[in-house]
Design a protein with these regions (language model features):
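Conserved pre-motif I regulatory segment
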Residues: 1-36
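Walker A/P-loop
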Residues: 28-50
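Conserved strand-helix element at the start of the C-terminal RecA-like helicase core
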Residues: 57-69, 86, 275-278, 484-506
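Conserved helicase ATPase core of P-loop NTP-dependent helicases/translocases
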Residues: 522-544
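A cross-taxon signal for low-complexity, glycine/charged-rich
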Residues: 336-350, 354-360, 653, 657
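N-terminal cationic and glycine-rich segments that engage phosphates or anionic surfaces
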Residues: 34, 87-136, 140-328, 362-486, ...
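Conserved RecA-like helicase motor-core motifs
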Residues: 80-89, 301, 454, 489-492, ...
Length: 723
């Protein structure tokens, strides 16, 4: 299928010129170009038009998860018939393994995986291996290890109605694909077999595939996971591995041999150096890890052995999302039924994709959004990771091969990406120097001019105050917020620290202002919901530190307040100020207030550049008779677009309600008295704690409390009715 752009708007302002310029550059084979577009000029719409014109699979890289989610949602609006997917880190919490020699402190890796985001990541790789019309919007996670696309592709499973099926071979294949067999409730990446019926829940969808089999597949049904209602019957189904790291038995045995060989060499080196502690530490660690992998297929930190499992040489970069782009041919879903690309495994009734059949050149487009931030971020990932790994290797916590479980170096990243377009309102010297063409997009189709910039001393008599009281920046801010709220508009406030953002938010709430904060400690999905709530009017003020600078598109915002603007530094540099000022450029009433007692060089340059852009836009408006108007943008629930449950961290009350609901289901058909059920659950809780299953023990503890509350309620004497 081809990319098909859908929009009620046509390119206007500087957009037509920018589109033609970028398309010309791509057709001429230019490796790097820069789109220098001011905030609110429709850079995303321009790039959507470019994608439709060149018809290339596209990788869009953003510098944070929130911006990536917003971009993904916008591209989904533009390309509703094509595959637009979201690829970011699936960790809600991540503490990397580390060792601090100074204090002799070892920190074990801790991580909390978000299953919803993991599902979206699988949707990305599966789209890349099944079609050509794919746009992936990713964070810097795109340069981290993901597993070999060749190994992943080898065991893709294609099941067709009417084909002969060896049930044992299919069971073995599903297990090899990292699917878990279960006899109870299905979850993503699991399957069960009941009589003649296979039920399989893929990792990238919230549905169940039900297969009825005898000597052949007689029926394939798509079933709703909750209601178990059959949505439709299908002629065939494609199943992809449940995990990105897929290793065959033969590859595992080879990896074990290589790990043991490397261990022997490293132990010999420690012995020569007289490092007895490091010798014993490494020997025990690797022996334990290998035993765990052998018995359960996994160990904590297994990714540190990825070089051996993937068969890579010393220093070779890991496989990443970029390799899936380079490997993609987009033929599975659309062409496979008529194509000779499939080979059937003899006597097993399983159609698998023949190795190498999907290989193609890396003919894809790369768009680096907010490149002035994203490029340095990509460049810095490798060095930080390497320093930490060197310490672990030196002190016997890891083998030297752990260094190759790493992000790509910047030069490796550049080797793997396709033709690149840097997109920024403030590109750095690097982008301008590297680009073969600079395309400007300064004029906004809406006629909107850059916002008015007001510099206000941190203490000053406010024009609306009748008394001589000197106002602080926060008191002045509250007056301005109240004015905007009366007009139904929103406000962004940037502070210097997370603590300041949290404290200011609490203070605003005390003043009956609907405010919330956002910073790096807020979980990915919650950040997205906070921004959606601001646009919907559930909150009026959003306070942040660094996440409010680049790219966030909120036309409802008419006031941006920058506190302590004269504190020169990273967060108050010329580029940072221009980007933050741009957050008010999508509203006709846009205004920016810089709270400062001194005029810094960064402030002066940012204000001067903003004024220059205002003059360019005003001249264009006058020449074309354009009246500025606020950008109109549909408010869509991004989480629902991704098929993710829209919820913040559950309140105690909602958790209690959920617990009660689970208990009701758990007790269906259990006619025992409540005290007996409580006693049984207490025993289960102790067993869980004894087995170190603390999460299960905590759930049982909460259930016991709920049941005891019911018992207490039932024992209360009923009040007598008054006559």
């Amino acid at each position: 299928m081809k990319f098909k752009l859908k929009s009620k708007y046509q390119p206007a302002g500087d957009q037509p010129k920018a589109i033609e310029g970028l398309v010309f550059g791509l057709e001429q084979g230019m490796r790097k170009q820069t789109l220098l577009g001011v905030t609110g000029s429709g850079k995303t719409f321009t790039m959507a038009n470019v994608i439709e014109r060149v018809q290339m699979p596209t990788l869009v890289i953003a510098h944070n998860k929130t911006l990536a989610a917003q971009l993904c949602n916008e591209f989904r609006e533009f390309f509703p018939e094509n595959a637009v997917e979201y690829f970011v880190s699936y960790y809600d919490y991540y503490q990397p393994e580390a060792y601090m020699p100074g204090s002799d402190t070892y920190i074990e890796k801790e991580a909390q995986v978000n299953e919803e985001i993991d599902r979206l990541r699988h949707a990305c790789t599966q789209a890349l291996l099944s079609r050509r019309d794919v746009i992936i919007v990713a964070s810097v996670s795109a340069i981290y290890g993901l597993g070999s696309p060749k190994e992943y592709e080898k065991i893709v499973l294609h099941l067709r109605r009417g084909e002969e099926l060896d049930r044992r071979a299919m069971l073995e294949q599903l297990v090899a694909m990292q699917f878990e067999r279960t006899n109870s409730e299905l979850k993503r990446g699991s399957f069960r077999l009941r009589g003649q019926v296979f039920e399989i829940m893929p990792v990238n969808e919230d549905v169940i595939y039900r297969l009825e089999i005898g000597t052949q597949i007689t029926r394939i049904e798509l079933v709703d996971r909750i209601t178990r209602i059959v949505k439709r019957e299908q002629e065939d189904v494609w199943l992809f591995p449940a995990k990105h790291y897929v290793v065959s038995d033969a590859a595992r045995e080879r990896a074990f041999m290589r790990i043991k060989s490397e261990l022997t060499e490293q132990l010999a080196m420690f012995e020569r150096q007289g490092k007895v502690l490091e010798y014993e530490r490494l020997k025990r660690r690797v022996a334990y890890d290998l035993e765990m992998i052998k018995n359960i297929g996994y160990c904590n930190g297994i990714e540190n052995y990825s070089r051996h499992f993937e068969g890579r040489g010393v220093g070779e970069p890991p496989f990443t999302l970029l390799d899936y782009f380079g490997h993609s041919a987009g033929v599975i879903a659309s062409e496979a039924k008529q194509s000779p690309r499939l080979s059937t495994t003899e006597n097993k009734g399983i159609a698998t994709v023949a190795s190498g059949d999907l290989a193609m050149t890396n003919g894809f487009l790369t768009i680096i959004d907010e490149s002035h931030v994203t490029v340095p971020q990509i460049r810095g990932m490798y060095n930080g990771d390497r320093a930490r790994k060197d310490t672990l290797v030196e002190h016997g916590f890891r083998l030297p091969s752990a260094r190759d479980n790493r992000p790509l170096r910047y030069e490796e990243f550049e080797e793997r990406v396709g033709q690149t377009v840097y997109v920024s309102a403030t590109p750095t010297e690097y982008e301008l120097k590297e680009s073969q063409q600079i395309v400007e997009q300064v004029v906004r189709p809406t006629g909107l001019v850059d916002p008015e910039v007001v510099v206000r001393p941190i203490s000053k008599k406010h024009e609306n105050m009748k008394t001589l009281k000197q106002l602080t920046q926060v008191e002045d801010l509250i007056i301005r917020i109240e004015e905007r709220v009366k007009q139904g508009e929103r406000v962004l406030v940037t502070t210097l620290t997370k603590k300041m953002a949290e404290d200011l938010t609490e203070y605003l709430k005390e003043k009956k202002i609907k405010a919330t904060y956002i910073h790096s400690d807020i979980l990915t999905l919650e950040r997205i919901e906070i921004i959606t709530d601001l646009r919907l009017g559930k909150s009026d003020v959003l306070v942040g530190v660094n996440l409010l600078r680049e790219g966030l598109d909120m036309p409802e915002v008419s006031l941006v307040a920058i506190l302590d603007a004269d504190k020169e530094g990273f967060l108050r540099s010329e580029t940072a100020l221009i980007q933050t000022i741009g957050r008010a450029a999508r509203n006709v009433n846009g205004q920016v207030v810089l709270y400062a007692d001194e005029m810094t060089g960064s402030m002066e340059r940012a204000i001067k550049e903003t004024e220059r852009r205002r003059k360019v836009q005003l001249a264009y408006n006058q020449a074309h008779g354009i009246t500025p108007k606020t950008i109109e943008k549909t408010i869509r629930n991004i989480l629902e677009e991704f098929g993710v449950s829209s919820k913040k961290q559950e309140s105690k009350e909602s958790k209690k309600q959920n617990r009660s609901g689970v208990l009701e289901l758990d007790m269906l058909g259990d006619a025992r008295p409540l005290p007996e059920i409580i006693k049984d659950k207490e025993m289960q809780m102790r067993e869980a704690a004894k087995g170190l299953e603390f999460e299960l023990a905590a759930i049982l503890r909460d259930e016991i409390r709920e049941l005891r509350a019911r018992v207490a309620t039932s024992l209360k004497p009923k009040s007598k009715k008054k006559k």
